[in-house]
Amino acid sequence: MCIVFSPREIVSELDRFIIGQNDAKRSVAIALRNRWRRQQLDGPMREEVMPKNILMIGPTGVGKTGIARRLAKLAGAPFVKVEATKFTEVGYVGRDVEQIIRDLVEIAISLVREKKRDEVKVKAHINAEERVLDALVGKTASPATRDSFRKKLREGELDEKEIEIEVADNNSNSASTFDIPGMPGAQMGIMNLSEIFGKMGSRIKVRKTTVKDSFKPLIDDESEKLLDQDQIIQEALRVAENDGIVFIDEIDKIATRDGAVSAAVSREGVQRDLLPLVEGTTIATKYGQIKTDHILFIASGAFHVSKPSDLLPELQGRLPIRVELNPLTREDLRRILTEPEASLIKQYIALMAMEEVRLEITDDAIDALADIAVDLNARIENIGARRLQTVMERVLDEISFTAPDKAGTSFKIDAAYVRQSIGDLAADLDLSRFIL
């Protein structure tokens, strides 16, 4: 399922969305390519080659999460992002780390199901069309009548005609799962009625709708009939095992500093629970067993207070590739505003265009935005590129609010407008702490 790219192509694709951080991009590109290389191997060697997990070190807002998320999207791989601080040691109240893998399996099933739906889309559309014709002319209509109505249907003449359709009521069979204390993963034994009795428990729901609006639910219904659920689950488990990517953020927050006494529930215990996951173990899910040996783990943290060596030595050894991401400079922030395919400025211009308002942002305005963001990051708290969103929202606040009343007009935003909108707030440190 994973799409194959060379490391150079991966870095080039990441460059379209993320500015700078070439070392991190190279590391994840090599890690992704190594997966493909491993899958080409035969025999025992294939099982022996383990992924080289990555530890990204850098302040917030410099692109750590963005790189991992884009990598997974690029590869078409199941991806789950978790925060290390959300988990507690097994035996305490809270989420245990095995839930990470269960979430990954759920995402893999969704990905595989969508892929299989695309494969049967044409057949499902044909079947849906037949059901619409049944609703229009009845199942006993002559072939000539059906052909006549089929022609009108395809030409859109019947789009607004109301019909009644029967579709499966999926909500009635939704699973009710919950954790049993002291039994991690116990929800795997609790299954909904449709899983136990097959389609016996499924209910039919009658809906009144127009011909045009009937196609989507009917195509979904027909797609489900054409899909082999067991095959989807087996393929999803394989995809999660071989292509899955787990991004563990804020891992520095569970690092125990020398001599530090913390009231938090065993940070070291969470690290110890992560060890078998990262090294390779078997996790029980309600869909079956899944091995974590070949899942790629990318951990990240700012390490402002703690340092990577404060992590358990065993966990450090399971994150062999270290990548330091650089704080963003003024030039980086300027490029972030303009260069990515969906840059902030392009987003705001597109949003205002929906109100028929033309937005023009000059080069000196972009310089001013970058200067203010750098200044605020230096004086208050360095939150990286995220500061740009705060500054942009403040600058465009009035235009966004009045846009519906200004259809057909143009706004030119220059450096003077930026400073007028935000200058006093940026200068007042007490105010900017709360507003910017």
From Swiss-Prot:
Localization per record: Cytoplasm
GO terms of biological process kind: protein unfolding; proteolysis involved in protein catabolic process
GO molecular function: ATP binding; ATP hydrolysis activity; peptidase activity; proteasome-activating activity
Keyword set includes Glycoprotein: no
Binding of ATP, residues: I19, G61, V62, G63, K64, T65, D249, E314, R386
GO CC terms, sorted: HslUV protease complex
Pfam families attached to this UniProt entry: AAA (PF00004), AAA_2 (PF07724)
SUPFAM superfamilies from the UniProt entry: P-loop containing nucleoside triphosphate hydrolases (SSF52540)
Keywords of the record: ATP-binding, Chaperone, Cytoplasm, Nucleotide-binding
Function (record text): ATPase subunit of a proteasome-like degradation complex; this subunit has chaperone activity. The binding of ATP and its subsequent hydrolysis by HslU are essential for unfolding of protein substrates subsequently hydrolyzed by HslV. HslU recognizes the N-terminal part of its protein substrates and unfolds these before they are guided to HslV for hydrolysis.
Assembly and binders: A double ring-shaped homohexamer of HslV is capped on each side by a ring-shaped HslU homohexamer. The assembly of the HslU/HslV complex is dependent on binding of ATP.
Family: Belongs to the ClpX chaperone family. HslU subfamily.
NCBIfam families: hslU, PRK05201.1
UniProt-recorded name of the protein: ATP-dependent protease ATPase subunit HslU
Organism whose genome encodes this protein: Bartonella quintana (strain Toulouse)
